[in-house]
Structures are given as C-alpha cells and as structure tokens.
C-alpha cells in the first residue's frame, strides 16, 4: 500500500455520457474521487462503462467524441472540458484496451519515443526515456523490431512503455495485461506497483482478472450498468462476495475457498492461505497434513480418446512464419479429432496465434504440411474452407465492418448463400447474449461485446472447426462460461489460445503448451498442471487452489473438488451456506 497519498488528483462529479448511435446511456451520474498515489482497481461486468470512464480522464471523451456529455471531471484541479488534450496527456496517460488501437509507429523505438518527442524533449533525453521505459517492461531487446511482428502481449508492453516514457501523474490502464502470460503479468504489475510506490504515480487499472490485480490494489471500485455500486479498500471489498457473485465477477480462489470454509479472511495467494488453515479448530477438523489424498473427483473436461476416430486436423513437421529467415513454428506435429476442445497455452511470442492461422489455412507452411478435413492447405485455396472453419482474431475489430451486430451475424450466411439467415443470426446473437444489441453499431460496444459479436458472426455459419484466439479477453466470468458452455454442449471441435489456466482446466479436453515455436506438452489438464517444469518453461503458474490442495495432500483441481476432499476426510466440516464453488 502506498503511504504517500496526497490531495485529490481525480475528481468526477455527476458524470453522464451516451455514445452516438446508442440508445442506452453508458455513464449514469458517476461520482468518484481518487487521491494522489492511490492504486485503484476498477472492475465490473462487460459493457458496464469502465473503458468509457477511463477515456474521460485524458479528454478523449468529450473532445474526440460526438456523444452526449455532462458533468465535471477535474484532473489535478483542471477541468478536462476546458483543457486541451496535449495538456491533459502530460497529467493522465491512458493505455488502451486494444494495443492495435494505440500503436501506429512502424518500430518499437518510434512508438515509445512519440510522446517525449511531442513534449519537445532533447534527443539525448528522449533516447534515455525510451531505454528506461523498454527496460521497465522487459522489451529492451526489441527496440528496433517492427511493431507488426510482435505478439499481443508484447504489443501491450510497448503501449505501457510509451506511457511510462512520459511519466504522467496518473496512469489509467484498460486491461493492460489481458494478452500477457501469467509470468509477464506479474512482471508488469510489479513494475507498476514500484512506480506507484516510489514515484507516487496514481494508478487506475481496469481489469476482469481481479485475482491478479487485487494483491496490488489499495482500493476496489465496482461498476454495473453505468453506475458505481461498490467503492471500498481492497482489504474490505471481498467481504461483500454476494456483489461479485451477482455480477458474475471472478473472485480470487483463496478468498472464495476461505469464504466457503467459513474462515473470515481474504487472502489473495496460496501462501497467505496456508497459515489460515493451521489455526484453531479448523486444523483439528481437516486433520494433519499432508495426508492420504481425499476422494478423487472426475475432471470437468475429461481426456479425449481418439480410438477409431480419424483426425479432423493433421499437422506434420510444420515450419511456418512471416519471414523465411525467421521461423515462428519449428517442427510442429499435431492431430485434432472431431469433438475435441483444445486449449493452446504458452509464453507470449511462442507461436500460438501463428499455429491457429495455419489451422485456419490463412498461412501456408514453409515446410511440412497441414491437412484439414483431409485436404492439404498447401494445394487448396483458403476460400475453399469458408463455411467449414470459423476463426476469431485476437483483435475482434479486424472482423467487424457492418453497421449493426445483426448485420455482422448475417454477413457470413449471406455470402455463403445459406438458408434461414434471419434465424441463424438470431440464434448466434442469442447464444452470445447480445441479441438486445442487434441494432447497435459494433464500434460503439465494449471490447467484450465486440468479441462476442465476432464469435456470433462465425456461429451463424455453423462451422465444423472453431478457432478462437484469446476468447476470454475483455470478458467477465459469466460471459466466458456462457460462451464455452455453448461449444461444450454442442460438441464443437474447438481450438482456443488462452493464458487463463482455470478456463483451460474447466473446458479443454486437452491442453497444448508451447514454447519458442514448439509444443513442449500435450495432454489432459490435470497432467499438464502438475508438471512444474513445463509450467515454468511456458511462463505459466498453478492456480492457487491446486497449490493449496497439494499442501493439504488432496488431489483436487477446483474449489469444489478441494472442499469435497476436505469433507471426505472429516465430515464435521461445515460449509458456508449459499456459496457457489
């Protein structure tokens, strides 16, 4: 916690805003004060207005928007409505939700130097600021790289560096680590916390991945339907779990576990949880540990048997990249069978997105071959797979060009001359919970809603093979589970890239782990998650509940399994009523 808090640096009063083309008001009477040096986590369901609120801090709204705006926003005592964006940008730096919306330079160096150059700094000072900023985000070795060659997580690092080079008083960050691997996320968050503590920079960070940000935050603010409904110190916020549950927000696993077991505490890590399990009567109830494993529960997504099942996708010795001198994939061998749900995980830049592009026939192998439905992608026109493969890019905006979400869902079926276009569009929009937005302009929606629009646009063609690149980005827990449940219920063949190991464990029948262009693990989630060496190589970490279960000597991979194991060991344990494990 930063002890150097000063006067109020952000003051928002009765803020209202409605986007052009939207019937519903996005921000509804927001009142918020943030003191200098605070680290504030802003969260809430997808589409509740978080990103819009951030855009008001540096004047993007209302100066670059034609929407309906009213209210007052003061940054360091300056009214944003009366100030130019150049002046505001010196005080409030904004890291966008999508790095592709922010990056416009051709090289990493030019992107990071742009801000200091516009502040008319000397060349020597600019070079030092670029060096320092890239070092802080772990991108020093990429200074001369093309921004187009970077992975999504690397682009996010560059966007953060471009703001750090200007050292603003306020750093407003919109899901800045959503495309980073877990190790990279912790690295960046540690850097941000150091800046908060040592430089007294005020941090306002929007994120759905509450479990990763909560340990760093002084304060938690929750929005819903354009309003602030909870504003409390981080140490107190999780005493109101019913609010998180009602809104479908993911609570840190240790907090959920302690609440389930009736322990009055809100630990954010496995390490903080261990001492709580050693206290008083609770230790007597769960017995001495480690002990013999508790009851072994079946996994949420059992392993897949490929016996007597011809592969839908067959990859042999695949070498692929965007430049012959720099291969991204190096000797990939892989089979995917009908009905499998395969999670692809690994470090940023390990080749996950490149693998998906090859499976979509959008890239052709430099060496080796990829066969989809038995057809070699080297000899087939990519358009021949249209209607059979549904692909959603990491950045959904690359796919959205129609004037409404309904038109997006109709576009594919219309081009393919399919029947029942209206019904197909309705079903796909309904499946993604955006039927109520069918007349809305996609560009006016939140990133999570835009991503679900992109998914709906491929569901309407009913593809045989579904490929999703980071489908959990910008999504709250309810929408993630609803999307993945849809594919699970339909028995879809699904390959999805993700850094979310909990979602991979819950929904994937199989997990591939990649590192430096190669598959280093391929198996059931339970088996992969136990291999600490593999996880370390891929910059992945075990979920806290798995660490806690191991500490207790129980073979469990979810809170439900862990609690069942504890009850099996000692039936006298009482579970808090009404808690959803």
Curated annotation (Swiss-Prot):
Cell membrane keyword on record: yes
Gene Ontology CC: ATP-binding cassette (ABC) transporter complex
EC number(s) stated in the UniProt entry for this protein: 7.-.-.-
Region of interest (Disordered), ranges: 287-309
Compartment(s): Cell membrane
Polar residues biased stretches: 300-309
Residue stretches making up the ABC transporter domain: 10-250, 313-541
Topology class, membrane: Peripheral membrane protein
MF-aspect GO terms: ATP binding; ATP hydrolysis activity; ATPase-coupled transmembrane transporter activity
Binding site for ATP 2: 346-353
Intrachain S-S bonds: none
Sequence positions that bind ATP 1: 44-51
PROSITE patterns registered for this protein in UniProt: ABC_TRANSPORTER_1, ABC_TRANSPORTER_2
Superkingdom as given in the UniProt entry: Archaea
Enzyme class, UniProt record, top EC level: translocase
Function recorded in the entry: Probably part of an ABC transporter complex. Responsible for energy coupling to the transport system.
Protein name: Putative ABC transporter ATP-binding protein MM_1996
Organism: Methanosarcina mazei (strain ATCC BAA-159 / DSM 3647 / Goe1 / Go1 / JCM 11833 / OCM 88)
């Amino acid at each position: 916690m930063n002890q150097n808090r000063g006067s109020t640096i952000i003051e928002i009063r009765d803020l209202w805003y409605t986007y052009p083309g939207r019937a519903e008001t996005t921000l509804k009477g927001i009142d918020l004060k943030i003191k200098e040096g605070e680290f504030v986590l802003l969260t809430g369901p997808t589409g509740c207005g978080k990103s819009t609120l951030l855009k008001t801090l540096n004047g993007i709204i209302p100066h670059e928007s034609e929407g309906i705006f009213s209210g007052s926003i003061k940054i360091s005592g300056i009214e944003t409505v009366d100030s130019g964006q150049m002046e505001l940008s010196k005080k409030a730096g904004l890291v966008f939700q999508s790095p592709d919306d922010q990056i416009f330079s051709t090289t990493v160096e030019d992107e990071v130097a742009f801000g200091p150059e516009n502040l008319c700094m000397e060349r020597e000072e600019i070079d030092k600021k670029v060096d320092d900023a890239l070092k802080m985000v772990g991108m020093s070795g990429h200074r001369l790289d093309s921004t187009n060659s970077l992975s999504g997580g690397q682009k996010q690092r560059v966007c953060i560096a471009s703001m750090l080079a200007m050292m603003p008083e306020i750093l407003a960050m919109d899901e800045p680590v959503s495309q980073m691997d877990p190790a990279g996320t912790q690295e960046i968050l540690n850097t941000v916390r150091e800046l908060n503590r040592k430089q007294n920079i005020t941090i306002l960070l929007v994120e759905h991945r509450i479990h990763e940000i909560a340990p760093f935050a002084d304060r938690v603010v929750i929005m819903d339907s354009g309003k602030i409904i909870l504003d409390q110190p981080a140490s107190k916020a999780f005493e109101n779990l019913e609010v998180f549950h009602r809104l479908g927000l993911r609570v840190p696993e240790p907090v959920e576990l302690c609440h389930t077991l009736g322990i009055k505490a809100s630990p954010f890590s496995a390490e903080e949880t261990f001492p709580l399990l050693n206290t008083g009567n609770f230790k007597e109830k769960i017995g001495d540990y480690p002990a013999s494993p508790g009851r072994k529960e079946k996994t949420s997504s059992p392993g897949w048997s490929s016996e007597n099942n011809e592969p839908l996708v067959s990859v042999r010795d695949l070498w692929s990249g965007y430049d012959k001198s720099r291969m991204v994939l190096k000797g990939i061998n892989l089979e995917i069978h009908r009905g499998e749900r395969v999670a692809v995980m690994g470090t940023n830049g390990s080749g996950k997105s490149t693998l998906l592009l090859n499976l979509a026939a959008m890239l052709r192998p430099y060496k080796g071959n990829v066969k989809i439905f038995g057809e070699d992608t080297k000899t087939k026109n990519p358009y021949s797979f249209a209607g059979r493969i549904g692909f959603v890019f990491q950045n959904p905006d690359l796919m959205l060009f129609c004037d409404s979400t309904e038109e997006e869902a109709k576009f594919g079926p219309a081009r393919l001359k399919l029947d029942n276009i209206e019904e197909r569009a309705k079903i796909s929009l309904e499946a993604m919970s955006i039927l109520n937005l069918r007349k809305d302009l996609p560009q006016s929606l939140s990133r999570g809603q835009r991503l679900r629009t992109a998914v709906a646009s491929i569901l309407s063609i009913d593809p045989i093979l579904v490929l999703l690149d980071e489908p959990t980005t910008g999504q709250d827990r309810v929408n993630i589970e609803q999307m993945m449940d849809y594919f699970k219920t339909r028995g879809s063949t699904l390959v999805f890239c993700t850094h979310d190991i909990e979602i991979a464990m819950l929904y994937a029948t199989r997990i591939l782990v990649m590192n430096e262009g190669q598959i280093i693990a391929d198996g059931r989630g339970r088996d992969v998650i136990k291999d600490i060496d593999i996880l370390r190589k891929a910059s992945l970490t075990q979920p806290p509940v798995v660490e806690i279960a191991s500490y207790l000597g129980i073979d469990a991979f979810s809170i439900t399994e862990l609690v069942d194991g504890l009850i099996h060991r000692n039936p006298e344990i009482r579970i808090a009523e009404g808690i959803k494990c």
